[in-house]
Amino acid sequence: MNHHHYSLVIFHLILFLSLDFPTLSHRFSPPLQNLTLYGDAFFRDRTISLTQQQPCFPSVTTPPSKPSSSGIGRALYVYPIKFLEPSTNTTASFSCRFSFSIIASPSCPFGDGFAFLITSNADSFVFSNGFLGLPNPDDSFIAVEFDTRFDPVHGDINDNHVGIDVSSIFSVSSVDAISKGFDLKSGKKMMAWIEYSDVLKLIRVWVGYSRVKPTSPVLSTQIDLSGKVKEYMHVGFSASNAGIGSALHIVERWKFRTFGSHSDAIQEEEEEKDEECLVCSGEVSENPKEIHRKGFNFRVTVVGLKIPVWSLLPGLAAIVILVAFIVFSLICGKKRISEEADSNSGLVRMPGRLSLAEIKSATSGFNENAIVGQGASATVYRGSIPSIGSVAVKRFDREHWPQCNRNPFTTEFTTMTGYLRHKNLVQFQGWCSEGTETALVFEYLPNGSLSEFLHKKPSSDPSEEIIVLSWKQRVNIILGVASALTYLHEECERQIIHRDVKTCNIMLDAEFNAKLGDFGLAEIYEHSALLAGRAATLPAGTMGYLAPEYVYTGVPSEKTDVYSFGVVVLEVCTGRRPVGDDGAVLVDLMWSHWETGKVLDGADIMLREEFDAEEMERVLMVGMVCAHPDSEKRPRVKDAVRIIRGEAPLPVLPARRPLLRIRPANEAEEMIVDGLVGEDLPWMTPKSHFS
């Protein structure tokens, strides 16, 4: 391995800002402001440029000369920040936002890009070929890269993407920028938001052209940083121009904040007015170093780098006194390319295979106390895997496979690994198949299933309070499920029919966002495939959610999922089960209310009428039209969403409950069934189909 030695000049800029900040306490004097610039980084027009422009195509008449710059630049906050409490192995959550732009040099291709960086070693660099100026893999670091150079050898998906790196230049996950609505090479100023929640073990990244944070993140990755960070880490930015590429990587407005381990979620900061400060703190202290070292509850803000020239004069004087030439050597070689790294490169982090020992360790040997759910073919355990974090382990029971007429493990595994990446779908994290044991590992969602919230019985303990989902939360849940189904039906490469949409399979995250799971019954079709050409299957699913035509023909379709979605909508609005303990059918009950002009009588009494009546009626009507007995009258889920949001007219419902019409595929006659009640369970799966 060849070793290369480089020297860097480190400029310690201490900027004494004598500005008045009305938003801060009058008892508080702004501490000494301090950034450290490395390599090519420099102040430029009230911003920081991490790199310098350099010639890409030197004249053939000009003799080659020694490069004037390393092509690498960094800007780090001078004080290390506490990220880990060693006694409890608790990691701080954090959030930051900053504006940036990447401007290519004339007649030059773009450089490597830049990264938001958290590193244990401020002086560690990988010099060979740039690599965004990231640290040596031997050091602990986390980086969110904004990459503009395509390097397929190291897992890049293209030359315009955002990725998350953890102590490696191989991204654990990445996403194409163009597909998410922004272009890193546009030269325009953009905003980025990065958040890590230690409770959720989740990193999320948002990017947009507006200062308003987008609704959905462009990248979301489940990862536990407790084993990835040191007690104190340095925070800032890093960039590089490698080879013939050259660009200015400019960072302007930057805010950074950490949160204690007790914080359940990242709290949105209000826009502050102290635009002129370089580094300022929201806490009162006479000792500036104390602000940045005292633990989890400190706050560091790096805001607008719009610094008047006169305010730099004291800092320039300090630079003349403090500048020192620090020569150091770094031993670095080629990137370590292991088989594991190769297997994890690509567009997204592919779920990895886990050993049975890891699964047993995660679940304490499949401890009964860790069980959080149980179905016909599998038991779900809560667990923890160091490389992933909190997980839900779905352990399959082979004894029940013959009853399912298929291998549910294989069905769900192939569906999840091949297609599904959506914010409203439970994310697949790994799998195990060893001996007679098979298991799938998913993200753990702390609030459990939607069914538990809708139908939880009062506790005998008077001190235990039942959480009632608000109307706003319920509408958001319905829209989340609709988004997931739209993705499955219309946006995936191949159409996926879930076949088991029900509240038990809708999970809720810490913020009560819906995530659809359990793809053990899913069917996959080409979008161009005709319904008539699909083979009939033995109807499978859950009584109360199955479309009538599916029960009688055995052919699943997008509209059979729509029917199930309609029942879910009614269940969420009313708080009633699809089939009550007394045999009452929810769909029938809602038609009875509709026929008497009292559809709002179906609203959940637990809401105590704390809802918008017009919106409630609109959503109930959507549920009824989606659960229409005639599949041709059901809307697409996407169209149902437009009605719920008031963007489309209300559906037209008949004055009386329509008759159920079944058209057998090979028979001329049609079957007409009037709406019955009680034991016959109209529009439901016949009892003979299920035990």
Curated annotation (Swiss-Prot):
It is a single-pass type I membrane protein. It holds the Pfam family PK_Tyr_Ser-Thr. Residues 333-691 are cytoplasmic. One of its GO terms (biological process) is defense response to oomycetes. GO terms for cellular component: plasma membrane. Residues 1-25 form the signal peptide. Keywords: ATP-binding, Cell membrane, Glycoprotein, Kinase, Lectin, Membrane, Nucleotide-binding, Plant defense, Receptor, Serine/threonine-protein kinase, Signal, Transferase, Transmembrane, Transmembrane helix. In the C-terminal section; belongs to the protein kinase superfamily. Ser/Thr protein kinase family. In the N-terminal section; belongs to the leguminous lectin family. This is L-type lectin-domain containing receptor kinase S.6. It comes from Arabidopsis thaliana.
